[in-house]
Amino acid sequence: MNKSELKPAVVFEQFAKINQIPRPSKREEKMIEYLKSWGESHGLDTKVDETGNVIIRKPATQGMENRKTVILQSHMDMVCDKLVDYEIDFDNDPIKTYVDGEWLTAEGTTLGADDGIGCAMELALLASDDIEHGPIECVFTRDEETGLTGAEGMKAGFMTGDFLINLDSEDEGEIFVSCAGGRNTTAKFTFRRTEVPAGYFFMRAQLKGLVGGHSGDDINKQRANAIKLLGRFLFAEMTKYEGVRLAQFNSGKLHNAIPRDGMFVIAVPHDLKENIKADWNIFASDVEDEFHVTDTQMVWTMESTDAQPVIEDQVARNFVYALQAVDNGIYAICQDPELNGMVETSSNIASIVTSDNEINIVSSQRSNVMSNLDNMCATIRATFLLAGAVAESGDGYPAWKMRSNSQLQKIVKESYVRLFGKEPVMRGIHAGLECGLFSERYPNLDMVSFGPTLRFVHTPDERLHIPTVQMVWDHLLDVLKNIPTV
């Protein structure tokens, strides 16, 4: 198969044009101008809001004028990543694609099918003159990937439809009907550094090789968290031996990832050195046994290191006590039977950075129920406040709660069964989607999310499964035919 043979041709033609346009997150100006010019050149009602979101409205086809209005929504930006030795200027150069069996992928870069393929479906529908549909609003949001900026900045009234279909999902056959809201809770311990008496020995411990993963979508896998493990060891040693002093603790890099590695530096009386090493080895063996399924490549090291001032003892102990006490992982499971045991509420301690006089901690909380998100954040904040830290939770983003009487879910499900002879998986996701922000501003909007199969998104290995594009296109058109009257 070559690119000229890709089906549906109308969608892949639009996707090829989109991939000529640079559209890195936060630098989507060329894409905004392209969409604006495209809509106007096709004689369609086209508007750009102050955030940079674009909406293109198309009237109903003949005989469909009394159907409810459907919003189709995708994000226009893409994650720009490349192989180390591949030359590209993402602000000016096109994405070069090729067919690899049943997959479309890119030469040395991310493909941009997340969410360029959703945008392509919208443009193909807008350009058509032979597809039955009621009134439609095609919405293209900006900067989804690095902050949900477009959805966050969209004001009520920009969209006016009754139903919304988000085209940003990555597994054909799965229909998303709910997503988690999320917030970051940060904590800060302030301290003075002191010198240790003569006779102390400094040791640097490191843990690496954990699997990690996304702190929302992967939290149900119950993988090891480097911060919690290192904190657990320190708690055991500092409550067992009076003389252990903490100098450094660093772990994690991203607010939305399970930390894969970490390190600490401690000072111990010389006569405790061998005891600490023995405890470290026993602890490593125990933890490897606990996580023998999820994390099989752990690497534990402990070695001598240079002397340095330590954190004042009471602050260090309060910090370690808080690490031991703070909730981490799954907190509650969804009660809706349709969501099939999905995680509802969770917390992940994500990163810790120690500087000369501060320890800064970032954690993330998620829930599909906003009151439980409030409670989870309060629990994390209270843990650190009790330990003497300054702690606060940010504004975050709202949940999209499953709608039990959804007309759109029923239409989408029945259409899928009619076309493919099997039921789709109706599910939620324990991560944030733009639908969460839409649900806050448009509380009566009935929404679903679906899309073709993508793999290795956000990496140069990103690939789009070609046969599923036709399936999603057929499904989308059948849904539009069956939208009810006003």
What are these regions (language model features)?
Residues 2-102:
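Acidic/His- and Gly-rich active-site-bordering loop/insert found
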Residues 7-11, 344-357, 420-478:
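Zn-dependent metallopeptidase/amidohydrolase metal-coordination segment
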Residues 36, 157, 223-240, 270-273, ...:
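His/Asp/Glu-rich mid-to-C-terminal helical/loop segments that flank catalytic regions of hydrolases
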Residues 64-146, 151-162, 184, 202, ...:
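Active-site metal-coordination/substrate-binding segment of hydrolases
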Residues 76-78, 139-147, 169-172, 211, ...:
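Acidic, glycine-rich active-site loops and adjacent beta-strand->loop/helix elements
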Residues 102-105, 145-146, 152, 156-366:
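Midchain, well-structured core segments that form catalytic/ion-binding scaffolds
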Residues 225-227, 232-249, 402-445:
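Active-site-adjacent substrate-binding region
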Residues 342-431:
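Substrate-recognition/cap regions that form aromatic- and gly/pro-loop-enriched pockets
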